A protein has these predicted regions:
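Transmembrane beta-strand segments that form the barrel wall of outer-membrane beta-barrel proteins
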Residues: 355-367, 379, 389-393
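Feature captures outer-membrane beta-barrel proteins of Gram-negative bacteria and organelles
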Residues: 222, 343-345, 373-384, 455
Length: 610
């Protein structure tokens, strides 16, 4: 039938029924009643005396029962408790000035249980310890030395004295507890001075988030438990029973704090001066704002406790490219702050009896990303009592957030297709695997800038009916983002394709391992048919990516709205229909991105790879 495949299975091949590499051979743990386990005369079969719930067999097959069903221990939604407190106090002082105060507090407590963690990069890349978090079962492991054939021959004598994990997941479920608190204090004053209304106030806010993660595994402690030569050693062949995971199971934390201080003064006058069509209104103001953020990570994540891959591993790595926690990428502590000062003004100018205009300007200076000046001009013409035409043009900016400016080296794992392997070995080659992306903040970032324009009309054919249509366009420059792992790998493939067999460097932001020959036609990583026009290269170890100001972007659209309201003896009722239509989305390719687009065309070196 239509659903008779694995598409809807939503299960993981990484489970407690582990797989291991011994050289190029794959050994898998099976249930005792599996056909592989009942082959008592087979030289490919191994058991551990006293463990009757498993066997180890020389096979890469993954049975249905060996796939993890996430829902076994996973909470779709854990308990959540929220508390809010908001208090207001307004009063008028003896001098006529109004004072207003606000105090608010928010707290939430939540928790959730997940499933066991799996090391990063499990799969074919784990051969010889080439994955992100390679795990070695060393020759000293007690349980490895207990594996034996039905005739008593030991695994370490007949196969090898060490194994690499290929697919695996710990049996201890992960979980987390989270507490978040936010408080805010506002104190303001408003009054009149001559013909001006004024309003001034301060805002102080602080938010904290404390999260504890449980059921996590330390790579350092795990290696020590695997190296143990006593029955207290971690048993990698346990299939979820009597594994001895307690010795390396730990809890870790992440604590975040953000703070905001803001003070401002605004003054407005409905009639600064008069024109033939009416009075001109004006608003002026100033603001100073300080923002801080502090992201504190656990010592096993931030590099205080440093983990390095085993010396036998093909992937030789350490912090900041890997952390000491299974299934977690490294993240440094991050701190950032900025002080922003702003001046702004606005004019409401009547140009004719039925023609109004608005003019606004805002200048802002930040001590990290620089200065910006933006403005707005708008017109509203009402030729009849039931119709109005309106148009506006403005400039705006979006500041880079504190993380994109201040973040240190942050490594994340994502599954990506390696275009070079596809180009060199064909579309049938399994070119998708886990790749590290190394991102970093950039203190040279500029704010995104945009030009916004719109034109439309408002119709009020009756007292209770309003119809609006607006055509708009947003053109953005210096969009902030990452070039992306896939684009970096495509650029690497393009450079190598253009350079031929002598181009062995490619994109310097793509770090590749050594090429490992596999001449076994039965192997899923067979590569003896490598394209002779390309320099041989190994899998991508990591891709270096930095936040940048990227390409220009244009977005066009049309907004429609119809609103009808009616008053009755039973109350007031209203209905509103809104539609947002995107007419065009255009992102201009520039620099390396333009090269990729050009190379992906018919006959180009990247044809069929994008």
């Amino acid at each position: 039938g239509a659903f008779n495949d694995t598409t809807w299975r939503n299960m993981s091949t990484s489970s407690v029924w582990a797989q291991f590499y011994e050289g190029s051979n794959v050994f898998t743990i099976f249930e005792p009643n599996d056909s592989n386990c009942t082959s008592n005369s087979s030289t490919n079969l191994y058991n551990i005396p006293g463990l009757d719930h498993m066997c180890l067999y020389d096979s890469s097959s993954i049975r249905d029962y060996a796939r993890l069903a996430y829902g076994t221990t996973y909470d779709k939604r854990g308990p959540l408790l929220r508390n809010n407190l908001v208090m207001f106090y307004n009063t008028t002082l003896d001098n006529g000035v109004e004072a207003y105060s606000e105090l608010s507090y928010y707290k939430s407590d939540s928790s959730k249980q997940l499933y066991g963690g799996a090391p990063l990069g499990m799969g074919t890349s784990a051969k010889n310890g080439g994955n992100t978090q390679p795990i070695l079962v060393p020759s000293t492991n007690y349980w490895l030395n207990q594996l034996q054939r039905p005739n008593g021959d030991l695994f370490v004598d007949k196969e090898g004295d060490e194994l690499w994990f290929r697919r695996f997941r710990f049996s201890t479920p992960r979980s987390w507890d989270s507490t978040r608190e936010t408080w805010r204090v506002v104190q303001g004053f408003r009054g009149e001075w001559n013909s001006w209304d004024w309003d001034s106030g301060i805002v102080v806010s602080r938010a904290t988030s404390e999260m504890d993660n449980h059921g996590r595994q330390s790579m350092t402690l795990l290696n020590a438990a695997l190296a143990d030569s006593t029955p207290n050693a971690y048993n990698p062949f346990c299939a979820g029973v009597g594994c001895n995971e307690e010795a390396f199971t730990v809890s870790i934390f992440r604590n975040n704090t953000t703070e905001l201080f803001s003070a401002d003064l605004k003054m407005s006058n409905d009639s600064v001066f008069s024109m033939p069509a009416g009075d001109v209104g004006m608003l002026v103001g100033a603001e100073v704002r300080k923002e801080t953020m502090d992201d504190a990570r656990d010592p096993r994540i931030n590099g205080t406790i440093v983990y390095s891959t085993p010396p036998q591993a093909a992937n030789q790595s350490t912090f900041p490219y890997i952390s000491d926690i299974v299934n977690s990428s490294p993240s440094p502590n991050t701190y950032g702050e900025r002080v922003v000062t702003s001046l702004f003004s606005e004019l409401q100018i009547p140009l004719a009896t039925n023609l109004d205009s608005q003019l606004a300007v805002r200048a802002e200076n930040s001590d990290d990303y620089g200065s910006n000046v933006v403005g707005k001009f708008a017109l509203g013409w009402e030729p009849t009592s039931w119709g109005k035409l309106r148009a506006s043009t403005s400039t705006s900016f979006r500041a880079p957030n504190l993380i994109t400016v201040n973040e240190g080296l942050v490594v994340r794992n994502n599954s990506q297709e390696d275009a070079l392997l596809t180009a060199a070995l064909g579309e049938e080659y399994p070119s998708g695997y886990s790749i590290q992306r190394v991102a970093q903040g950039n203190d040279d970032l500029e704010a995104e800038e945009a030009t916004n324009s719109s034109v439309g009309f408002v119709l009020t054919p009756g007292d209770n009916l309003i119809v609006t249509v607006d055509k708009w366009e947003i053109a953005t420059e210096n969009t902030i983002g990452l070039f992306g792992e896939r684009n970096h790998i495509l650029l690497d493939t393009l450079i190598r394709s253009r350079g031929g067999v002598n181009e062995c460097v490619g994109n310097p932001n793509v770090i590749r391992g050594d090429f490992i020959e596999d001449n076994d036609p039965e192997s899923d990583t067979y590569n003896a048919n490598w394209n002779p026009n390309l320099c041989k290269a190994g899998n991508v170890v990591r891709v270096n990516d930095t936040y940048l100001n990227l390409d220009n972007r244009t977005l066009k659209g049309t907004d429609y709205a119809i609103e009808y309201s009616v008053d009755t003896d039973a109350g007031s009722f209203s209905a509103k229909f809104m539609r947002v239509q995107f007419d065009e989305f255009l992102q201009e390719a520039s620099g390396p991105m333009a090269e990729l687009v050009a190379a992906s065309g018919a006959g180009g070196p990247l044809e069929g790879l994008i």
